[in-house]
Each structure stands twice: as structure tokens, then as C-alpha cells.
Amino acid sequence: MKVGGTALAQIKSKLREFAQVGVSFIDIEKQATVLIQEAGMQPSFSTVPGYHWSTCIMKNDALCHGIPDNQIIASGDIITIDVGLINQGYHLDTTISFGVGEITTKQRRFLEIGQKSLSKAIACAKVGQSVYQISRAMEKVLLEENYGAVYQLTGHGVGKELHMEPTIPCVANPEDRRVRLTEGQTLAIEVMYSMGNPQLIVDADEWTFRTKDGSLTAMFEETVLVTAHGPEILTKGR
């Protein structure tokens, strides 16, 4: 998984550079597929029943599971790219949100807080720690800024399958105090949040989740290995 994680980190970085004003979502999707194949690996998301793409791409009020289509990126958009791959039978998953062109100070702060929230959550991914501690650390950062932590979707275990136990909510659940981390687990830890009400609705395509109130969203995700010495981010750029 470390080899796959390094490759996915590089792909994520290249897709961010590629996603400029005037580029379409489907162009990003095509680029992602080429990069995954050039790395000698396979797309992960297209193994999900009914989903036929290598990426999920969203902007602004759309948070996740967005089908890459002919939408064009404009200056001021907040773009989210979620991409996964399979290497030697193991899935890895990562997501980044970023502004394109001219974005506001408010938007920039919004993105910075998401990155901080994810960092605090990952720091809790230690042997013997609970899922509750991860969720609480994530949620605390968001609440301090009056942002909404998404409660309808979660992070997850990842490895031989794309979605595995445990589920890792963005909102702390006291019952998750009983779910303890063990050495060697790999987790897709993701912060999903909104500038307004975090309630989500699903588009007519039956995939794309977006905020009901139309507020701005973002998502940051890394695949993390739980080791005896602490968390190791497999999809972090080297």
C-alpha cells in the first residue's frame, strides 16, 4: 500500500495542477485514468457497482460522489477531486479541495480550517486510540469556526476493499469509544464540512451529494496506516 499511496499522492498533485480555469470535469477524469494506468495500477472507484469513473469531481456546494461531466471550471470555484486506485489488490483513497483563480479570504480560510481539522484527526490515529477521538478532534476544529460537520457520510477503513470497517464519522459518536485502533489498520480519514448547514441532498443523478442550503463545501482525505510509532499518511506527497 505504501507504493500505491506514493503513486496516488503524485496523481493527486498532478490533477490539482491540471484543474485550471476552462478545464472540464471530464478532462480531469480522463487525465486521472491515464495517470493511474501509466503507474501500472487500476482505478478503484469504477469497481463500485453502478459507478463507471476513476474520480469524483465536485465544485462549491457539491460535496462528494460527483460524476465527472462537462462542467467547466471558472475562476473563484472551490473544486474537490476524490480519486482512488488499486495496487496489488489494495485500495487507496484520497481527496483534496482547492480554489481556482481568484478566491476570497473567506474561502481561503475555509479551506485552511479543513486541512487543520484533518491533521488533528490523523494525529489521533494511534494504536489503542478510539474512532471517537478521531471524530472529536475533527469536529472540534470545525465547530470552533462555526462550520458544519457533515453527519450523513463518513470516512472508513480501506485496504482489500474500498469501503471497510470501521466507519469514521466527522461528528463524534460516544458509542465509537468502544472502537479501538490496532496496529496495521489502514483508514481513509476524511473531513467533510460546509460553511452553512451541513445537511445534504442527492442530485437527480443519484450520486452527487450537495448542501441543501447551497452553502460552500470542502473535503480533505488521506489514507493512513496505524503503526506502533503513530500514524503514517500513505497518500501524502513526498
PLM regions with names:
Residues 1-238:
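Active-site neighborhoods and metal-handling regions in enzymes and metal-associated proteins
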